[in-house]
């Protein structure tokens, strides 16, 4: 077969295959054009998820009849100066979208230039039969796309169900709307309004916050940390969720480069690294993060749909994003998700009561931190009625007892006012600490809370020096389930030695432990080694040192922490609460689960109809 030039229509159809994959691709290209046209209002209408009809209307600068004719030709644009290709600040710049869409659909464009007397219309069928006529239209542009992919029927077979295609389109519109809070957006499907976003005209931070509330939801903002980070060539702003407010997938992560929505692996990895101390590996944060960077330091022309970018210095960008997110999380480090308390209150409204089960015992706190305002009579009644105690009571004046009560109450009130997590009141099921503040009660998971404290303590210690070791009086022999796990621990013995563990191989499946980290105290060595083996065997020999330290620190923290089922005194409970208040990121354990929930008094009163 001889080599020949392709026809213009064939070239356009090939280009369409790269740029236009589904109705959402059409909506993306046309809405971005409307944004570039300085629109303040953009309306989208769909039928059958865009397969039958897509209409995009805007109030932008519009086009003349001559511009209409040129706009539907390949590689024509008004958006940048070709002499300055490195400074691209618009969504579009290749001049491919309109001719590519026209080549595979029936297109009708109606436009009126601002302050012009007439509107004009151009009609194309499969990219051909171009007809420009005078029309009637308001200022701006309306583009109608009918019978998408009629000219490439094979592509129709690859489209998903209407519901799936519609969801993709809604996602595209939401991303663009997030980046442009000053623009009003509406989206209608088969006559039903799906999205109506009002343009905001306040300061930039307020505009962004309101648009995020409208698109992602008010719950997200309540459970998110604000990011504000700047360098001479770089700025990052937006919101990222508290670790306890997370999802099972990364679908709710919105990332932008110079207001362009991207799905960039570098940024996603940076996000994962920033949260690695706070989230389990199968959970994902929610975020809307906007990176503004000098256009000369980023290449947006590396992907047909411009979904990916290439940075001049990717490591620099990655490290800055990690630092920005960690700084934001640190500022919100003691806060746990508000939705957790709401969910708990909902359960109280509809309790599942088992009438056969006995009421669990609650251990009351009888110390200076108790918030029970007893009378003299009630105190005397709680004292055992034996001869020694009775004789002691007889020697005490009522005035002294009442003074002790007043001192106790005053001390309690000071704690409730001074400390965020309040004063410990009781221990529930020997697992949860109940404390009281001025306007709420706080329920703390003692194991999760102490595990976070231990994790941070061990991690900080490892940054400066090796862990101090304690030699076991009798070396511990740990038998593991298989040889692979024993070999894995032995392969990492030198690294583990720096982390406080001294071990040797003992037979095929056993490890002998002679030294452990002093910080762990009287730890169950068998369980510690088995847990470490489980963690590390999945990675083999190639695990990086930083990742090894992460896994070891997590395992140490788990064995260092107070276990559920251990009774705590009032002093121990209050000491734990005070440590939490002074430790960063104490609102969640390192798997993203909350360490405490707070129930406001007003919400509790509402449960009782007060």
Swiss-Prot record:
Family assignment from sequence similarity: Belongs to the DNA mismatch repair MutL/HexB family.
Tree of life domain: Bacteria
InterPro entries in UniProt: DNA_mismatch_repair_CS (IPR014762), DNA_mismatch_repair_MutL (IPR020667), DNA_mismatch_S5_2-like (IPR013507), HATPase_C_sf (IPR036890), MutL/Mlh/PMS (IPR002099), MutL/Mlh/Pms-like (IPR038973), MutL_C (IPR014790), MutL_C_dimsub (IPR042120)
Gene that this sequence comes from: mutL
Gene Ontology molecular function: ATP binding; ATP hydrolysis activity; ATP-dependent DNA damage sensor activity; mismatched DNA binding
Chain's role: This protein is involved in the repair of mismatches in DNA. It is required for dam-dependent methyl-directed DNA mismatch repair. May act as a 'molecular matchmaker', a protein that promotes the formation of a stable complex between two or more DNA-binding proteins in an ATP-dependent manner without itself being part of a final effector complex.
HAMAP family: DNA_mis_repair
Taxonomic source organism: Rickettsia rickettsii (strain Iowa)
Protein name (record): DNA mismatch repair protein MutL
